Regions:
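Surface-exposed intrinsically disordered loops and tails
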Residues: 8-14, 83, 88-97, 189-199
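Short, amphipathic alpha-helical segments
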Residues: 30-34, 52, 105, 160, ...
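Active-site-adjacent structural segments surrounding the nucleophilic cysteine of cysteine proteases
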Residues: 43-138
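Conserved active-site-adjacent core of cysteine acyl-enzyme catalytic domains
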Residues: 117-203
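Extracellular structured ligand-interaction cores
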Residues: 35-39, 55, 103, 175, ...
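Non-cytosolic beta-sandwich-type ligand-binding/adhesion modules
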Residues: 1-67
Length: 204
């Protein structure tokens, strides 16, 4: 359930075949089994008979986690890509924002920078308050993060992409948000990242 002016919240249904974890749908199945179809059901609700919500976009991204079954992403020929790209994207640090939420608003802060890069004038706190998931009790629901951009009239979606896709977006002058996992130690459970903002994170 999502909306700007309601107590929004995700759910975590689960059965023998599949489960939802906040913003991610997982196929359980036996080893080697995958899904072949995806079906959406969207319900629009309003307490005012004269007002209806507007649905502009429904999207999903997928990733096959089985070895050797990666689904390639189509991108144009990359021979013309510049070696380096520097975008003048407005920057915020979540760690110097509202002290009560600053350490946990990486997604809203990132989306704020991307929206301001496209002409908006927002603060991370106001984006965070529109994004908060009352069931998950956090700000890291990426479905809600991109829905915030949609509420301002932008077309936005989360995407399992590779480095070439990111390079094309940057070369086209479009800022990109990344969700990363890393460890500050070479012996950590995630890929090692020197001088990372957090000691170790399963998602930042």
């Amino acid at each position: 359930k999502w909306g700007i002016d309601l107590k929004r919240g995700s759910t975590d249904p689960s059965n023998a075949l599949a489960a939802v974890d906040t913003d991610t749908f997982y196929i359980k199945g036996s080893d080697g089994e995958t899904a072949s179809k995806l079906q959406f059901q969207v319900t629009l609700h309003s307490n005012n008979a004269g007002v209806t919500p507007t649905l502009r976009n429904v999207s999903a991204t997928l990733k096959n986690t089985l070895d050797g079954q990666a689904i390639p992403i189509y991108i144009p020929d990359d021979s013309a890509l510049p070696e380096k790209v520097l975008l003048d994207t407005p920057c915020y640090s979540q760690m110097v924002r509202d002290a009560s939420i600053g350490s946990v608003i990486c997604s809203p802060t990132t989306m704020t920078m991307m929206l301001n890069d496209r002409g908006m004038n927002l603060f991370p706190e106001e984006v965070a308050l529109r994004e908060y998931d009352f069931n998950y009790e956090g700000f890291g629901n990426w479905s809600y993060t991109v829905a915030i951009a949609g509420s301002y009239g932008f077309s936005a979606y989360a995407h399992y992409a590779d480095l070439d896709f990111v390079r094309h977006e940057l070369a086209a002058g479009r800022s990109v948000a990344l969700s990363v996992q890393y460890s500050s130690s070479p012996n950590g459970s995630y890929p090692y990242l020197e001088n990372g903002a957090a000691n170790s994170t399963g998602g930042h």
